Amino acid sequence: MASIEFGVALPSVRGVGEFARLAERLGYDYLTCGEHVMFHGPVSNSLIALSVAAGATEKIKLMSSIVLLPLYNPVMLAKQTAVLDVASDGRYHMGVGIGGEFPKEFEACGVPVKQRGSRSNEALELIRKLWTEKNVSFEGRYTRFSGVTLEPAPVQKPHPPIWVAGRKEPAMRRAATYGDGWLPYMYTPEMLRESLTKIDAFGREAGRDMSAFRPGLFIFTSVYPDRKEAEEVAARSLGKNYAQDFSKIAGRYVLYGSPEDCPGRWQADLQCPLNSSTIEKLPHPPKRFATRATSWSALERKSLRRGDVLALW
């Protein structure tokens, strides 16, 4: 069985350094952070938060999950992410998405929400050039320039990995064209399997070698002693975050249950083709997460190994 890496998302804009050190100490492979300019509640900025985390850690990989790509000037984003990769000694992974579920932030930033897909595609093409080439000229629909070299260049070669997030076919095509990995959210294992088949076909259609393409999955988790409590917390937390009723669908998209339940559910889910990276988001405050995570002994973690697979919550 191929190796699966696990990550955990920052749960708050506060205490970033402390949480990052905890995640690294517990052995997570990735620390991730999402962002919005504005949403239904306080939301971080991934590049700023991960910069703080970079200074507090040494080994854990740092992933934006996601950068809200169409709201950025792509030249500035290329610069900021290159510097973050250098500052973290080559640990940055750029997860990208196009947003659109909160149109007010597009209006506030002066970006037409209907252009978010085309802007993102152009930005990805441009950013890869600026990361890897010198004296770059670019003639796009939204950005034009000539003779630009960004220094320092990223540490990782050929460039920091690009993970494309989304749920629908345009995002799959974007991943197949520009991405190094696929990072959907609110997906079942079956949905992941179907999407990867499409992405592979789209990539081959575009003439890409897809053998190194990495499938991932952003999973919401809720771990409590009582399974019913875990389900209720999951529905309540997601409902608050997304201003929707999750009471009927939390069970479809959330890994919830007791510390004893969840490993078994993971073992079933690991039959899906998730052979590179999984990102988890825990709807627990940092202190509760620390208590739950540290209570799961090293022996219990080792018992979950199947080949190179390690399932953590």
Task: Show where each model-derived region lies.
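C-terminal helical cap(s) of enzyme catalytic domains, especially alpha/beta-barrels
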Residues: 124-127, 192-199, 285-304
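Short, acidic/polar
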Residues: 12-23, 80, 166-174, 258-268
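N-terminal beta1-alpha1-beta2 module of alpha/beta enzyme domains
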Residues: 1-57, 61, 157-160, 282, ...
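N-terminal small/glycine-rich loop or linker at the start of catalytic domains
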Residues: 1-10, 100-104, 143-159, 227-251
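Conserved, mostly hydrophobic/aromatic
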Residues: 27, 53, 84, 127, ...
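Hydrophobic faces of well-ordered beta-strands that scaffold small-molecule active sites
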Residues: 6-8, 31-33, 62-64, 92-96, ...
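Active-site mouth loops of central-metabolism enzymes
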Residues: 4-14, 67-74, 159-167, 248-260
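Flexible, glycine-rich active-site loops centered on histidine and acidic residues
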Residues: 2-11, 70-137, 185-186, 190-194
